[in-house]
Amino acid sequence: MFKKLFGKGKEVQKDIAIYTPLTGEFVKIEDIPDPVFAQKMMGEGFGINPTEGEVVSPIAGRVDNVFPTKHAIGLKADNGLELLVHIGLDTVQLDGEGFEVLVSSGDEVNVGDPLVRFNLEYINNNAKSVISPIIITNTDQAASINIYDENAVIKGETKVIDVTMN
């Protein structure tokens, strides 16, 4: 009550929508051709088989981590949700080749803000797969996760998950 009266503190929403960060074909997590992701060892989520080489922010929050090899970005929402956007499979071995990171750790982002551009053809030819996992890495802190089974998805526009944090 005092927070509302005196304007101190920020009301944090427990519910958050996760939008697809890539345009392409929705892939169920169980169908990602990598057991670390398919068996949910890193957390719950989904994959996208991209049709273009731009990643946008799937949530409003901040950039928590930009991997030195440019193939993945960690994001954190105000409500504590942590999200990993991993471009392709076994792309760490490319050592940043074919990727252009557009943000830095600590940057505030909104849904649809560009994060990374990548050369889709290069990754298709040099990595295990272009299928890109999007993973909630702190699934244990979520009260509920509802994943929508989509087909074709559009970056920054198609909502794919609703999460309620504890």
Curated annotation (Swiss-Prot):
<dbReference type="InterPro" id="IPR011055">
    <property type="entry name" value="Dup_hybrid_motif"/>
</dbReference>
<feature type="binding site">
    <location>
        <position position="71"/>
    </location>
    <ligand>
        <name>Zn(2+)</name>
    </ligand>
</feature>
<dbReference type="GO" id="GO:0016301">
    <property type="term" value="F:kinase activity"/>
</dbReference>
<feature type="active site" description="Tele-phosphohistidine intermediate; for EIIA activity">
    <location>
        <position position="86"/>
    </location>
</feature>
<feature type="site" description="Important for phospho-donor activity">
    <location>
        <position position="71"/>
    </location>
</feature>
<keyword id="KW-0762">Sugar transport</keyword>
<keyword id="KW-0597">Phosphoprotein</keyword>
<keyword id="KW-0963">Cytoplasm</keyword>
<protein>
    <recommendedName>
        <fullName>PTS system glucose-specific EIIA component</fullName>
    </recommendedName>
</protein>
<keyword id="KW-0808">Transferase</keyword>
<keyword id="KW-0479">Metal-binding</keyword>
<keyword id="KW-0598">Phosphotransferase system</keyword>
<feature type="modified residue" description="Phosphohistidine; by HPr">
    <location>
        <position position="86"/>
    </location>
</feature>
<dbReference type="GO" id="GO:0046872">
    <property type="term" value="F:metal ion binding"/>
</dbReference>
<feature type="domain" description="PTS EIIA type-1">
    <location>
        <begin position="34"/>
        <end position="138"/>
    </location>
</feature>
<dbReference type="InterPro" id="IPR001127">
    <property type="entry name" value="PTS_EIIA_1_perm"/>
</dbReference>
<comment type="function">
    <text>The phosphoenolpyruvate-dependent sugar phosphotransferase system (sugar PTS), a major carbohydrate active transport system, catalyzes the phosphorylation of incoming sugar substrates concomitantly with their translocation across the cell membrane. The enzyme II complex composed of PtsG and Crr is involved in glucose transport.</text>
</comment>
<dbReference type="Pfam" id="PF00358">
    <property type="entry name" value="PTS_EIIA_1"/>
</dbReference>
<comment type="subunit">
    <text>Heterodimer with glycerol kinase (glpk).</text>
</comment>
<dbReference type="GO" id="GO:0005737">
    <property type="term" value="C:cytoplasm"/>
</dbReference>
<feature type="binding site">
    <location>
        <position position="86"/>
    </location>
    <ligand>
        <name>Zn(2+)</name>
    </ligand>
</feature>
<keyword id="KW-0862">Zinc</keyword>
<dbReference type="GO" id="GO:0009401">
    <property type="term" value="P:phosphoenolpyruvate-dependent sugar phosphotransferase system"/>
</dbReference>
<keyword id="KW-0418">Kinase</keyword>
<keyword id="KW-0813">Transport</keyword>
<dbReference type="InterPro" id="IPR050890">
    <property type="entry name" value="PTS_EIIA_component"/>
</dbReference>
